[in-house]
Amino acid sequence: MIVGVAYAKPTVQVWKHVDVPEGTSAREAIERSGLLAQFPEIDLAVNKVGIFGAICPLDRTLAEGDRVEIYRPIHPEAELLEKKR
């Protein structure tokens, strides 16, 4: 089955389609996507993940067409930085 795995930084967004077997978890799809090697700053012990904007555990079993999103931690002063713009 085909699922998507997405990660975004302020300067680059990546969305990969990954062919995975039935029963694949979010963690397994992320590992198969190659994004952990491409973006070594991703730490699955720290970064939250979700499917279509809803946070989920890494062991969540995926369905055909799901989009797994890897979220960056929010900077503690992000709101202040946004107001300065």
Curated annotation (Swiss-Prot):
UniProt-listed HAMAP family: UPF0125_RnfH
InterPro entries: Mopterin_synth/thiamin_S_b, RnfH, RnfH_sf
Stated family: Belongs to the UPF0125 (RnfH) family.
Lineage of origin: Bacteria, Pseudomonadati, Pseudomonadota, Alphaproteobacteria, Rhodobacterales
Species assigned in the record: Cereibacter sphaeroides (strain ATCC 17023 / DSM 158 / JCM 6121 / CCUG 31486 / LMG 2827 / NBRC 12203 / NCIMB 8253 / ATH 2.4.1.) (Rhodobacter sphaeroides)
Protein name per its UniProtKB record: Protein RnfH
PANTHER family for the chain: UPF0125 PROTEIN RATB (PTHR37483:SF1)
Lineage top rank: taxon: Bacteria
Designated gene of the protein: rnfH
